[in-house]
Amino acid sequence: MKVLILACLVALAIAREQEELNVVGETVESLSSSEESITHINKKIEKFQSEEQQQTEDELQDKIHPFAQAQSLVYPFTGPIPNSLPQNILPLTQTPVVVPPFLQPEIMGVPKVKETMVPKHKEMPFPKYPVEPFTESQSLTLTDVEKLHLPLPLVQSWMHQPPQPLSPTVMFPPQSVLSLSQPKVLPVPQKAVPQRDMPIQAFLLYQEPVLGPVRGPFPILV
């Protein structure tokens, strides 16, 4: 009985080992199949990625290719275009160009001769007016004032004055004034009269312009 029990236990153990081996084999096969499937899937993914990349590159090439074709259509010819003229057209006649001869020295000398023939403009010297010494008999007139080139306000003030001869003598009042006035009568002191040989310009500058009408000297009553 014990032997049969031992034999049954051994058979069960062997059966279990075989089952375990089968399970291990199946797991190994499943793992190998899973690995194969994984590799296959990876290959499919890589193939899909490569196809997508190739498709995008093709699309880019398709976009670039028409642009390059358009540029090539704008400039189809790189070399020079020969101008083929028909043989019936006659060539253009060239008109003869007349070149004037250079001026000879004889011709150039004509203006110089003209310049020598035409007299040059001579500048006349400025005439100097003679200055005569002032005498007692002389008196200033309008023409003398204009010749002196005096300022306009001074000339106008003199034009309103009546002409008066210049004399170094002292003028005394009439006898009627002497009879009515006090016994002591002093004449008005005259201004200093310039020398007789002094020119008119210096005499006019020496005098002071008179604003009112010129009258004779009046005596000073003391």
UniProtKB/Swiss-Prot annotation:
A cellular component annotation (GO) from this entry: extracellular space
UniProt note on tissues of expression: Mammary gland specific. Secreted in milk.
Q: Which UniProt keywords apply?
A: Milk protein, Phosphoprotein, Secreted, Signal
Subcellular location(s) per record: Secreted
So which domain of life are we looking at? Eukaryota
- Record has Cell inner membrane as a keyword: no
Annotated positions of the Phosphothreonine modification: T27
Q: Which residues carry this modification: Phosphoserine?
A: S30, S32, S33, S34
Which Pfam families would you find in this protein's record? Casein
Read off the InterPro entries from this record: Casein (IPR001588), Casein_beta (IPR016345)
Where is the secretion signal located? 1-15
**What family is reported?**
Belongs to the beta-casein family.
Q: What does this gene product do?
A: Important role in determination of the surface properties of the casein micelles.
What is this protein identified as?
A: Beta-casein
Gene for this protein?
CSN2
